């Protein structure tokens, strides 16, 4: 017959600590530190040690046999600004040079360069586009412009109605993985942050394009930068228009956008940034909402206004 036997080990429990001579720690004749190991570990933990990096970022540019150290690109994948190497999340950065080399026509074409980003487009030139990350849906990402959420609160179908043109963009940050803690519940699978260029000098740029099927487009940008005492000013205004009759039935579209950015910096102590944007487009949906009717049309209007204060 089997009998279950429980062996109970002797143990000591401390309800209080005493500094008397007969106390246990004093009898040992040694100094005992409680909890010092965890404190020391946290004080020496580096961001690089806990980072998840897809690829190692080399910030050195080799040209003509000489090495040039490039400036680090700060990303917004955390509460505090940090470089790509320090980010604890997978962050892909599409630089301005990448955009030039890709010869892209729209922002949606640029997003196709990022690993893990799925861009599904049912019209030309970025019309009616759905964007998703890592196999998620179009409602599970957040689109930001200079850190400001510009996602449509009603549906993710209109997330690509950007109020900026491709010429306004400095770089694009793609944050893969859950980011709801930082950017809200819609950032379930990630977030995309579009960072615009900051005016460094005075300049004017304009372009006009045209093609078959009544395609026409025009855009322009004006910027200026100057200093008054300890204040640094940077202003930029841009606008664009594009239309086409479409290569197939019910694929015509007409779209336009306008964007303005005002930046003020005071003696490297604080920055004030204000941005204002508007985007409008109308297009043929081409049986998107129902297969019963061939001719379907939709019109969307988006507006953006934000004011940000940053302390150094």
Regions found by a protein language model. Give the residues of each.
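N-terminal periplasmic "start-of-domain" segments of outer-membrane beta-barrel proteins
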Residues: 68-100, 130, 259
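Extracytoplasmic beta-strand/coil segments of soluble accessory domains associated
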Residues: 83, 108, 112-148, 170
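Non-catalytic regulatory/gating segments with a bias toward low-complexity or hydrophobic composition
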Residues: 91, 99, 111, 172-173, ...
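Membrane-embedded beta-strand positions of outer-membrane beta-barrel proteins
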Residues: 111, 192, 204-208, 235-239, ...
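Short acidic/polar hinge/loop motifs at secondary-structure boundaries
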Residues: 130, 148-176, 194-197
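Short strand-turn segments of transmembrane beta-barrel domains in outer membranes
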Residues: 191, 196-226, 238-239, 244-251
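Flexible loop and strand-edge segments within Gram-negative outer membrane beta-barrel domains
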Residues: 244-251, 255, 269-312
């Amino acid at each position: 017959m089997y009998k279950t036997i429980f062996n109970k080990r002797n143990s000591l429990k401390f309800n209080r600590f005493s500094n008397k001579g007969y106390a246990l720690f004093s009898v040992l004749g040694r100094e005992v530190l409680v909890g010092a190991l965890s404190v020391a570990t946290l004080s020496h933990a580096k961001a690089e040690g806990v980072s998840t990096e897809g690829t190692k970022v080399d910030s050195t540019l080799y040209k003509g046999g000489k090495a040039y150290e490039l400036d680090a690109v700060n990303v917004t994948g955390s509460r505090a600004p940090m470089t790509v190497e320090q980010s604890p999340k997978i962050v892909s950065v599409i630089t301005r040079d990448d955009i030039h080399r890709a010869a892209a026509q729209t922002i949606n074409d640029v997003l196709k360069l990022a690993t893990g980003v799925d861009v599904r487009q049912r019209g030309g030139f970025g019309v009616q586009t759905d964007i998703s990350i890592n196999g998620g849906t179009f409602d599970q990402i957040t689109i930001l412009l200079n850190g400001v959420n510009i996602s449509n609160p009603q549906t993710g179908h209109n997330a690509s109605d950007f109020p900026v043109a491709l010429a306004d963009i400095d770089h694009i940050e793609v944050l893969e993985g859950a980011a709801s803690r930082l950017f809200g519940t819609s950032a379930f699978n990630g977030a995309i942050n579009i960072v615009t260029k900051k005016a460094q000098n005075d300049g004017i740029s304009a372009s006009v394009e045209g093609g078959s099927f009544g395609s026409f487009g025009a855009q322009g940008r004006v910027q200026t930068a100057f200093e008054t005492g300890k204040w640094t000013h940077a202003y930029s205004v841009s606008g664009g228009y594009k239309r086409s009759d479409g290569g197939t039935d019910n694929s015509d579209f007409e779209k336009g956008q306008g964007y303005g950015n005002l930046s003020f910096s005071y003696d490297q102590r604080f920055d004030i940034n204000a941005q204002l944007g508007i985007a409008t487009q109308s297009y043929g949906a081409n049986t998107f909402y129902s297969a019963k009717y061939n001719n379907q049309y939709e019109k969307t209007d988006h507006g953006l206004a934000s004011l940000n204060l940053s302390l150094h």
